[in-house]
Amino acid sequence: MSNASGTLLSYMFMMLLGLTLASLVPHETDDGDLNAEISLANRHSQGSFTSDYSKHLDVKQAKDFVTWLLNTKRRGVDAQAGANLEKRHSDGSFTNDMNVMLDRMSAKNFLEWLKQQGRG
């Protein structure tokens, strides 16, 4: 586990512990202001946690994308794409040459068949 992940987990644990403790504080029914303050504190801590966690996920996603981008460049995906394009071109050229040859053979066979039909 990396240091940043460990720090994040510690931070998340502390936030969850704080939320749990805040929810366990006894509510005084005589004083509505105390309940309102606790409620505001809970909402603030939940909002702060959500905001910080979202920022962390955005940064992690950006780092993962950059890592992926660098890895694909290093592996030579661009070179592979060029090789695939050349292979497709050569395959297409071969197929085209075969089609031309087969068309000529078919025409030659047809002419020979016509000649044989004319003799008979």
Curated annotation (Swiss-Prot):
Cysteines joined through disulfide linkages: none
Classification via Pfam families: Hormone_2 (PF00123)
Annotated SMART domains: GLUCA (SM00070)
Positions of the propeptide segment: 75-86
Keywords in alphabetical order: Cleavage on pair of basic residues, Hormone, Secreted, Signal
Keyword Signal (UniProt): yes
One Gene Ontology CC term in the entry: extracellular region
Gene3D superfamilies registered for this protein in UniProt: 6.10.250.590
Any GO MF annotation of the entry: hormone activity
InterPro entries, per database record: Glucagon, Glucagon_GIP_secretin_VIP
Record's subcellular location: Secreted
Similarity comment: Belongs to the glucagon family.
Function: Promotes hydrolysis of glycogen and lipids, and raises the blood sugar level.
Protein name: Glucagon-2
Gene name for this UniProt entry: gcg2
